[in-house]
Amino acid sequence: LGAALSFEGRSSNVRSIGEPTLEKSIKGAKDSFVETLRTNTALVRRRICTPKLKVVENAVGRKSHTNVAVMFIDGVVDPALVEETCRRLDALDVDALVSTGTFEEYIVDKSLSPFPQLLHTERPDRFAAYLLEGRVGILADGLPVGLVLPVTFAEFMRVGDDRANHFSYAAVLTLLRYLALFIALYLPALYVAVALYHQEMIPTG
């Protein structure tokens, strides 16, 4: 025939897709991200089957050359947000990307802020839902989590299964979380104030 075919037949030792360990799901999907970038992007594409889902890849790390993928939906996300995210990744000057802490330290606005500015999730369904809301997602080879930005404090009061429940039920659960946070913050201070400075308010009889 005068022709030959060549193809790669080796296998790689990678972890198979399993259930989330931190974000347990009751009614939602049971799969989670793994340490392989190609597998993670495929998990997202399975949920968002549109050509408008874009992936911009880059290599981060002077020595590690870790593949990093920026994912977003064209026409939904703010183009300025995508441009700024890619610019900060290009300016990332580190030897190796070994953990998500590198992103936290170098690409956020205020690295010393006590409040997280990136949301970590190991669930592809939650990651895809944020992309549909107009946010930018970051996946990196070797990291079994996806990063979402920008986020507000309210996002950390929601869980992945909120989208699997009816809106009214999810809203009640979110309200209870805020109530629990309020009690945890103010009830101890109120008790100390009453016990030390306003003992007359405590019934003795």
Where are these regions (language model features)?
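Cytosolic regulatory modules rich in charged/polar residues
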Residues: 1-205
